[in-house]
């Protein structure tokens, strides 16, 4: 590897190949503790994994290997915490919402409701990605690079462990035998036992059942939707063109559109249904419903122009009454002749501009003119995640601008990933979550509050959204779907090519930097943006190319089994093919290497130079003609006035370049880029990339820079002879050519091989068909069976249906193969929705092809676990369900950021990480640190920015950027670095789990246990913004976790393993032997069941089992089992074993080993009390973290709420009583006031129009008081302030979105009257603080609705 010049600190040694052998044996320094020998399983649990050696997986003690333990999937939230100042959430981060609900939340929003459908058992899944878990507070340990000095990361792991008292330390040291197994029992109460519930509309009773099985997440299924008050105008159809769940979504959307937000805009609705449920028909139904009510115009925005035909199909399928669909791309800028119908456009069309002047300079202005003033029709933002990053892109701003300029429009957001990441919600301004009259003035405030609240906060938000009637999210069950992972080893020859490429890129970095220094280039942001963009694409192409041969073999095998194949790609590599064509005057003699093209294009177009190289298309660019013209590469578009619309895109030149594996530079440029006028530059020979400056280094500099450039080009061309050719062309060629393969991508032409062996370039266009229709024709050929292989790219396949549809001729089972997996499970599921949709004959098979590069297997595990949780089955060996914890596979959270920070600081600064290095690295520790430091510098990570012209490396190195960059390391180096990062990540999580600070999201309370009962319930009123009166339920839950003898016997009869069965302990304690039932899982690991605690969370090894227990018959086990089961109902383990317990003798409660566990939780308006409860808990336990749990009682009632540790119960109850008294005091004050005089209603309310979507609390929750109202208050008296007084009264219009039983008609009528008639007479004053004048409080009641409402 050629030496890379560092960006700082002088020279460093050139690359040396690692010496052979030299594997080292590492010892875990965490293990040198006197207490480790007895408690190593509970102190340092490990992850069970087939491909990773995680931290501590093989601990050493005195040179002897300790028994390996497995990672427990359950975790405890103990009532005692370590006194530490480093917590994932500080108390202040929760105060900004202490008295403000994010949404209007009904009284029973989070309380229990009967659960009629049965749960589908699934496995550990965090339903919502934990991207929001990243703390927005800039702390020392979260910084990317610590240049010098000791690394101030989170507290020292050893200190953390030793300073945190073990659970055993809370018991008397005179009872050592009592404490055995204590910690494993304590971890029983929480776990990830994810379930999905079969979805059936609960309050909508119209329509027939959906043709396929649909499920809803267990969290959302725990809360009810609002009552239906809207009556559809859609005619009933005997053909059942709309299913019951589609009609339900239409009803709730139209019902929400009747609500006005405090800003005066009409409320919007979010359809979060997954792929295949039928969002298209639902949207079409909303448009038809409004058409029948006289609103004849609608806007429909989507990701691709091709989806216009799908929109027409959806309208036709539901028998729409002749509604025309007009494509905006086919309408001239000055043409507004279309009077009604649906105007269909892409998001990129919103920023289109006309070069010819005329009446309409922009598409946005043309759309506004077409809609007309006072437009109240439907605006559909389909696949609305394409509009993300709205604050930083011109397209996103246009989406927001359109909504603000049409305030009365009925907005519908449709996206399967819409509410999964709060950052993606910035364009959803009509949900009323932030803005005027809400707790959050801006979206940034909302985002900051949610991100700081931890993993479960967004799930609570989604639940409140559902309760409020603004959100619905269902997804197709993956029942019947199968998948498998194909691991493809890298051949030695390919590894050599890969390593050569990595070294050449390191040299290129040095050469680029040297050339920039020589010419005195000051601004380098765009230069390095282009460099790292090309770097990412180059190695992505190499990763894909390694899998092509195996994919062709698998595809041919599946075709021979009478199946058909769908291959998913992210990009096409067409840009390089067109460049070679231009260089060779339209002739080709071989397939083109996309990887080589990326490298050459970077050097030719962006190498630092004082001359402007006038490339094709340079200068002032014209708008692309309506027919799709030649595709411009991403590199050539950067500096020429191009707006890039892609995941992670930004107006900054280098933003978003290191997004994900699923970024598709060429195809995104083709489909999502609009070329506008480039900024005008002086006609200097230097490009816009470089500042106008004099040649400061003399005339010889230009020649020297040119020599550097030509030398680098020669080396790239030499390497290019060994690089793989274009993946897409190679696949089509090896699978039979264009005659056998249906290509649905965005490219215009392809390279094909003729029978005589020659290679030619041909257009994909066909006679009589425009290029826009080629993909549709190819889809028809695949669905009819004319072609049995389809290749789709992400950019062009959005919304395309390729399932084994009952209505098409080709009903062979689909085998969906993917060469690239995105690093987000949500995005992967979205892609798989192309072949798994409603009304299919057979479910598809998925094949993930992965290599051994940079942890690809770990990312495949993320997607596999998500598929399993949705009901899919793997062909391979299923892991034990209790070991599935998806959270450990997600790096995009605060633990990933901290792990990255720690790894970089350790490698660059040699600080102590306390995490063992990867075993067996050639050369040992010294070689590892030397190679990793040099490698990080060679990929631009870890360097610092200076004015002397060194590398401009982003300060905020994200996880995705890190994972992309390390692909540029040699194979053995990137795998070792990824392993080290992964081990550090796991270690940080384990530390926080030990100290009770790990945020595991929403967990299930006592998963797998049916004996859960609600013992008692107390009701408290909570203060809130802008009205009081929301209800919080305090519940005491009892869990009987014991296992009856009959249940144990039934389970034992099903066991077949040689070591399965009942066991008795060798040790006799209190004249009794311990009894258990062991069930072998995989290898030597056993799941253990005990009569008092049921299933034990930790797995036991065969060695530990046989050391303490011996096998017995069923007859021998019965008496000890039944005795232990009966005694443990009221007696702790200490009493059972020793006939006494020190804690009970002291008058305290001991729950050790008891069957019956008591838990305390809060349900109801959680967001209103979150801040105050967190503050109380912080005082008691030094942690403000609130664990959100869900459960299902034995009588099938589901509950979601905050679990209160037993030690905090007393203080929490005191706080609830204070809040309740405060609210009741205000209510009493309001009852004593004279209610306002009823006035005539002047605001019309047509049939079916509902302005009040609120609930009344259950009668038992709060006794029905007489009718009362808050009166208007006089101007404030500075000398007299009422105790507990709140801020000045809010304008009534700001109350319109709250569900506190507000009489909206009266509020709106009062507003209109005040606007028309001016100030009115002030009612009799009352002592207090308020706005006075013309303002008056809204009527609030806890009884049935008012007669006039």
UniProtKB/Swiss-Prot annotation:
Expressed in the spleen and bone marrow, and to a lesser extent in the kidney, liver, brain, skin, heart and muscle. Expressed predominantly in osteoclasts, and to a lesser extent in T-cells, B-cells and osteoblasts. Expressed in macrophages. InterPro entries: P-loop_NTPase, SBNO_Helicase_C_dom, SNO, SNO_AAA. It comes from the Eukaryota. Pfam families: AAA_34, Helicase_C_4, SBNO. GO terms for biological process: bone mineralization; bone trabecula morphogenesis; cellular response to interleukin-11; cellular response to interleukin-6; cellular response to leukemia inhibitory factor; cellular response to lipopolysaccharide; macrophage activation involved in immune response; multinuclear osteoclast differentiation. Residues 177-188 have a biased composition (Acidic residues). Induction: Up-regulated by interleukin IL6 together with soluble interleukin receptor IL6R in astrocytes. Up-regulated by interleukins such as IL1B or tumor necrosis factor TNF in astrocytes (at protein level). Up-regulated also by other cytokines such as interleukin IL11, oncostatin M (OSM) and leukemia inhibitory factor (LIF). Up-regulated by lipopolysaccharide (LPS). Up-regulated by interleukin IL10 in a STAT3-dependent manner in bone marrow derived macrophages. Up-regulated by TNFSF11//RANKL in a c-Fos/FOS-dependent manner. Residues 609-631 have a biased composition (Basic residues). Belongs to the SBNO family. This is Protein strawberry notch homolog 2. It comes from Mus musculus. The lineage of its organism: Eukaryota, Metazoa, Chordata, Craniata, Vertebrata. The gene is Sbno2.
């Amino acid at each position: 590897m050629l030496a890379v010049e560092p960006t700082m600190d002088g020279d460093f040694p050139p690359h040396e190949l690692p010496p052979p052998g030299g594997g080292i044996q590492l010892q875990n320094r965490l293990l040198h503790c006197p207490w480790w020998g007895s408690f190593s399983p509970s102190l340092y649990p490990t992850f069970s994994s087939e491909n990773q050696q995680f931290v501590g997986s093989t601990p050493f003690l005195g040179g002897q290997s300790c028994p390996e333990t497995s990672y427990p999937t359950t975790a405890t939230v103990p009532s005692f915490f370590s006194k530490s100042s480093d917590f994932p959430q500080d108390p202040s981060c929760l105060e900004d919402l202490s008295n403000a609900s994010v949404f209007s939340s009904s009284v029973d929003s989070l309380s229990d409701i009967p659960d009629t459908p049965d749960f589908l058992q699934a496995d550990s899944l965090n339903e919502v990605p934990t991207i929001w878990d990243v703390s927005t507070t800039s702390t020392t340990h979260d910084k990317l690079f610590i240049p010098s000095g000791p690394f101030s990361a989170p507290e020292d792991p050893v200190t953390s462990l030793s300073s945190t008292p073990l659970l055993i330390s809370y018991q008397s040291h005179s009872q050592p035998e009592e404490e055995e197994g204590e910690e494993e029992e304590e971890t029983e109460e929480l776990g990830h036992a994810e379930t999905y519930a079969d979805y059936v509309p609960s309050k909508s009773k119209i329509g027939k059942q959906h043709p396929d099985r649909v499920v809803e997440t267990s969290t959302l299924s725990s809360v009810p939707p609002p009552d239906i008050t809207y009556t559809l105008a859609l005619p009933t159809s005997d053909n059942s063109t709309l299913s019951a769940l589609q009609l339900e979504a239409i009803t709730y959307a139209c019902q929400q559109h009747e609500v006005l937000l405090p800003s005066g805009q009409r409320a919007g609705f979010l359809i979060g249904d997954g792929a295949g449920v039928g969002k298209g028909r639902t949207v079409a139904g909303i448009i038809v419903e409004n058409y029948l009510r006289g609103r004849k115009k609608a806007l429909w925005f989507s990701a691709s122009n091709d989806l216009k035909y799908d929109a027409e199909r959806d309208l036709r399928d539901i028998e729409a009454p002749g509604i025309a669909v007009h494509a905006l791309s086919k309408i001239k800028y000055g043409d507004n002749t279309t009077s009604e119908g649906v105007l269909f456009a892409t998001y990129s069309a919103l920023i289109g501009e006309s070069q010819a002047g005329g009446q309409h300079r922009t598409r946005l202005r043309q759309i506004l003119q077409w809609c007309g003033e006072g437009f109240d029709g439907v605006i559909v933002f389909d696949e609305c995640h394409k509009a993300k990053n709205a604050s930083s892109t011109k397209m996103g701003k246009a989406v927001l601008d359109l909504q603000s300029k049409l305030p009365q429009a009925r907005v519908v957001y449709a996206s399967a990933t819409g509410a999964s990441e709060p950052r993606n919600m910035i364009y959803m301004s009509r949900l009323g979550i932030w803005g005027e009259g809400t707790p959050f003035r801006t979206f940034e405030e909302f985002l900051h509050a949610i991100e700081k609240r931890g993993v479960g906060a967004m799930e609570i938000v989604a639940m409140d959204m559902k309760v409020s009637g603004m959100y619905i999210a269902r997804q197709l069950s993956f029942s019947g779907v199968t998948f498998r992972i194909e691991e493809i080893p890298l051949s030695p020859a390919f590894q050599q090519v890969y390593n050569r490429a990595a070294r050449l890129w390191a040299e290129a970095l040095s050469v680029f930097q040297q050339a920039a220094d020589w010419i005195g280039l000051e601004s380098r942001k765009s230069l390095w943006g282009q460099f790292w963009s090309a770097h990412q694409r180059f190695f992505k192409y190499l990763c894909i190319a390694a899998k092509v041969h195996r994919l062709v073999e698998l595809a041919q095998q599946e075709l021979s089994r009478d199946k058909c194949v769908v291959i998913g790609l992210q990009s096409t590599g067409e840009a390089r093919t067109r460049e070679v064509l231009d260089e060779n005057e339209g002739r080709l003699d071989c397939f083109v290497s996309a990887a080589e093209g990326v490298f050459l294009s970077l050097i030719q177009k962006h190498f630092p130079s004082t001359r402007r190289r006038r490339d094709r298309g340079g200068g002032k660019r014209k708008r692309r003609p309506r027919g799709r013209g030649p595709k411009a590469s991403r590199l050539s578009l950067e500096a020429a006035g191009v707006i890039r619309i892609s995941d992670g895109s930004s107006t900054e030149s280098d933003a978003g370049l290191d997004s994900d594996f699923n970024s598709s530079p060429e195809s995104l440029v083709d489909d999502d880029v609009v070329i506008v006028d480039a900024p005008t530059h002086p006609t200097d020979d230097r490009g816009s990339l470089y500042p106008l400056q004099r040649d400061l280094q003399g005339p010889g500099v230009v020649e020297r820079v040119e020599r550097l450039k030509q030398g680098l080009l020669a080396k790239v061309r030499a390497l290019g002879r060994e690089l793989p050719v274009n993946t897409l062309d190679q696949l089509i060629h090896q699978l039979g050519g264009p005659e056998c393969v249906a290509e649905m991508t965005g490219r215009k032409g392809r390279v094909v091989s003729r029978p005589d062996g020659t290679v030619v370039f041909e257009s994909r266009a066909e006679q009589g068909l425009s290029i826009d229709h080629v993909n549709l024709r190819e889809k028809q050929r695949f669905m009819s069976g004319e072609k049995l292989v389809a290749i789709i790219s992400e950019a062009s396949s959005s919304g395309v249906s390729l399932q084994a549809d009952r209505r098409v001729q080709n009903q062979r089972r689909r085998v969906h193969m993917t060469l690239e997996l995105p690093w987000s499970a949500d995005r992967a599921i979205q892609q798989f929705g192309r072949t798994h949709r409603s009304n299919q004959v057979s479910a598809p098979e998925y094949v993930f092809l992965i290599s051994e590069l940079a942890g690809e297997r770990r990312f495949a595990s993320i997607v596999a676990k998500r598929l399993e949780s949705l009901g899919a089955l793997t062909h391979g060996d299923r892991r034990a369900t209790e070991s599935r914890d998806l959270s450990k596979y997600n790096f995009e959270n605060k633990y990933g950021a901290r792990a990255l920070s720690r790894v970089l600081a350790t490698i660059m600064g040699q600080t102590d990480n306390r995490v063992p290095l990867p075993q067996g690295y050639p050369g040992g520790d010294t070689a590892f640190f030397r190679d990793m430091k040099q490698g990080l510098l060679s990929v631009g990570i870890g360097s610092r920015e200076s004015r002397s012209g060194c590398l401009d490396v982003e300060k905020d190195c994200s996880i995705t950027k890190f994972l992309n960059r390390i692909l540029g390391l040699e194979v053995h180096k990137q795998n070792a670095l990824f392993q080290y990062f992964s081990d550090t990540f796991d270690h940080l999580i384990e530390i926080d789990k030990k100290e009770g600070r790990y945020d595991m999201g929403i967990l299930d309370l006592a998963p797998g246990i049916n004996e859960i009962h609600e013992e008692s319930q107390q009701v408290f009123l909570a203060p809130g913004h802008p009205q009081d009166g929301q209800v919080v339920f305090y519940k005491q839950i009892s869990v009987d976790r014991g296992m009856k003898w009959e249940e144990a016997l039934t389970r034992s009869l099903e066991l077949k393993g040689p070591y399965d069965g009942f066991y008795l302990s060798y040790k006799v304690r209190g004249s009794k032997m311990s009894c258990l039932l062991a069930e072998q899982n995989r290898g030597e690991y056993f799941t253990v069941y005990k009569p008092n605690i049921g299933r034990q969370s930790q797995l036991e090894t065969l060695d530990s089992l046989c050391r303490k227990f011996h096998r017995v018959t069923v007859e021998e086990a019965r008496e000890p089992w039944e005795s232990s089961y009966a005694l443990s109902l009221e007696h702790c383990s200490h009493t059972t074993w020793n006939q006494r317990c020190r804690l009970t003798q002291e008058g305290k409660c001991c729950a050790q080993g008891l069957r019956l566990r008591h838990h305390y939780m809060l349900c109801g308006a959680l967001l209103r009390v979150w801040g105050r409860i967190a503050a109380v808990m912080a005082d008691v336990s030094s942690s403000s973290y609130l664990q959100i749990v869900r459960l299902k009682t034995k009588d099938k009632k589901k509950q979601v709420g905050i679990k209160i540790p037993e030690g905090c119960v007393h203080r929490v109850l005191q706080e609830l009583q204070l809040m309740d008294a405060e609210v009741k005091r205000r209510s009493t004050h309001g009852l004593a006031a004279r209610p306002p005089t009823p006035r005539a209603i002047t605001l019309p309310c047509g049939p079916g129009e509902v302005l009040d979507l609120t609930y009344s609390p259950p009668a038992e929750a709060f006794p029905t008081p007489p009718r009362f109202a808050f009166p208007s208050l006089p101007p404030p008296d500075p000398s007299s302030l009422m105790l507990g007084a709140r801020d000045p009264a809010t304008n009534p219009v700001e109350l319109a979105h709250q569900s506190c039983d507000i009489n909206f008609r009266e509020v709106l009528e009062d507003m209109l009257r005040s606007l028309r008639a001016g100030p009115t007479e002030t009612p009799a004053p009352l002592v207090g603080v308020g706005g006075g004048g013309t303002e008056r409080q809204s009527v609030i009641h806890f009884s049935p609705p008012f007669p006039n409402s």
